[in-house]
Structures are given as structure tokens and as C-alpha cells.
């Protein structure tokens, strides 16, 4: 069925202008919604992760919020976040500190722990097997990690910056499905790539027709979601729109 999309959205977090109060956001980037409709948001310029219950006017700071810095109680331009249900913790990509950190969601938590450092991380995803997938936008690759593993396994890109099917150029956000297929917003190639498990190269599944605003094009894609039918939803940044690509569509 072709769902009818309402043209007017409903504000569920922020909306009170740019700022650092708990009813405000300042450059929100990645977000994650859990099974209870609780939302955690990487509030990038506020150097914090803020949690929002559906219907609340104010959020609650659950990581960072102690200014910009590299102490374990601070964050530095967090760009993506997810919830690890198994350990009831937040996993956060900190762009400014080039590290991935974990913060417990238990009350009383005042600092995080470093999982991986020296990584130009942007996007995070966790598969059903609790593997952590991280994009590195300087190495132009995506790696898969077991929690506690520092090196990981290459799963997409890793052949330098470029537009070949075995390359990426500034990979940002990720989505991983139940088959461990990795979808990547390949930002500067203006396309979304799909890498099947174990593949040596990816498949272009959205965009890839150069920078532009035609319906066949994307311009610096960011946020990404893939539903169970393989339909791709992507935030088309420079075109200021959200695009839906059905499986097999050109």
C-alpha cells in the first residue's frame, strides 16, 4: 500500500529555538528511538546526549552536558548515538574526541568509558548479534566490532576515497538489517550503498547520478533508515528533503 504522508510534522523535541536549556537543541544530529518511544538525541553543539519521552516539553541530559572537552564526563561534538539494550547503555560517537564511548543509562551515571579511540567516527549501528558497526569518514570505510574489540573487521569500503563500487567517499550514517547487510550514506558520492555480508563491493541503491535535485539524485545524504521491505528513507541534506526509494527503483 502507498502510505499517504502528512505534509505537516509534529514537534517531539526542541522547537524553542537554538540554545542549551533542556527544552532546546543546538544542531541535533543522530537520534535513536527505543521500543518505549523514548528518544535519545546527539545534541551536537551542546556536547551532550539528551533523552526525550514522547509528549514531554523538556528533555533530560543523559551523557555529557559538562561543556566541551575530553574528560570522561564530557562529550565533544557527539554526532551519533544508539541504545545497547543488552547492557542498558548508550553508545556514542564523539567526533571532536575521535572516539566511541559508552555511558550506562542507570541513574547516578556521571561519566562514560572509552570503547574505541583514534577513529574518525560518524555513524553507528548495532546488528542483532550485538556487533557494532562504525563508519570512518577519513579512512572511507565501515568496520564491524565486537564490544571490547579495538580493531574490528572491514565490511564496506577501505579502498581509499573514490567512487568505485568498492570505495566510499565520506561515509556518514549507517543501517544494518537482520541479514547483516550494511547500508551506507556515501555522502560525497551522493548515493546510498548496500554491502551484503562478506561482499567485496557494494551496490548503488539510491542516488549515484551525481549531485543534483532530480528525483534520481541525492545531494550529500545523511540519515538513513531501511524498512523490512527494503524501502530506503534517506535525509537528502543539501536538497532539504527526505527521500523514499523502493527496492529496485532507479
Predicted regions, residues:
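Structural signal for beta-propeller blades
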Residues: 47-50, 98-101, 140-143, 152, ...
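Conserved beta-propeller blade signature
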Residues: 39-40, 89-91, 131-134, 182-183, ...
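Asp-box/WD-like beta-propeller blade repeats and closely related beta-sheet repeat scaffolds
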Residues: 97-132
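Beta-strand-rich domains and repeat architectures in extracellular enzymes and scaffolds
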Residues: 15-47
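Loop/turn-rich, solvent-exposed surfaces of beta-rich toroidal or solenoidal domains
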Residues: 215-249
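Residue-level detector of Asp-centered blade-edge/turn motifs that repeat once per structural unit
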Residues: 33-36, 83-87, 126-129, 176-179, ...
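Gly/Pro-rich loop segments of beta-rich domains
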Residues: 1-27, 56-79, 107-120, 148-172, ...
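Short loop/turn segments immediately following the C-termini of beta-strands
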Residues: 36, 44, 54, 86, ...
